[in-house]
Each structure stands twice: as C-alpha cells, then as structure tokens.
Amino acid sequence: MASAISVSVHCPGAIAGLSAATAAAVVGVPAAMLAAPTRSRPTVARARQLAVYLHHFALGASVSACARLFARDRATVRNALARIETMRDDPRFDHCAARLQAAIAAQRDMILALIAEGAAQ
C-alpha cells in the first residue's frame, strides 16, 4: 500500500488514470465521460462503476479518493462497489474482473519500478 501513496506524490495521473482508461476501453466508451458531472447513459454508468471498483480494489484507493477522481459522492461510490460485487457472482464476469484487476496492478507495479529507476539515477 505504501507504494501507491508514493506514486500519488510523484505522478498522480500516471496511476490514477489506469482504472478509468481500462474500464472505458473494455466497455467501449470515452474515458473522459467517466468523470462527467451529469448522469450518463447506462453504458457509461456501468463503465464508471467498473472503473471505481478497479480503482478501489486494484489500486487501493479509498472511497473518498474514488469519489474525488470520478466526481461523485461517497454514497455513489459505495453503490458502484456493491453493484460490481454483485455482478461478480457471474463466473464469466468474475473472471474478467479478476484479470482486469491483475492487469492494472501489473501496470501500477511497472510504473513504480520506472519511477524507482529514475530516482536511483
């Protein structure tokens, strides 16, 4: 968890955007729409819920941090987390979500390693 904190100090956008970009690409919507201040069509809402879930569980972000990143309140973030957890009851979706979490965690680790290499030079 400490590594996620150090990244937020050095390059907040490098890590924060991983969940949104991944969820948007998988669902097929523009990533910029995930933080739009208005309600969106169901496809965008589902992508946002997935992004919130990935940001929270794959990157270890707090509910408050997720709320700030996606321009939502904490209750909405908790609702998104619950909806995706329910969707994970479907084995196919669960497999997909697990792979997305692993991919985002791997990207985070790669970015952290590059930061560490740069700091060592």
Each predicted region: which residue ranges?
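Short, amphipathic alpha-helical "recognition" segments used to contact nucleic acids or chromatin
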Residues: 45-60
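General nucleic-acid-binding
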Residues: 1-21, 113-121
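Helix-turn-helix DNA-binding helix
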Residues: 76-78
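Short Lys/Arg-enriched helix C-cap and helix-to-coil transition segments
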Residues: 88-107
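Short, Lys/Arg-enriched anionic-surface-contact patches
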Residues: 25-48
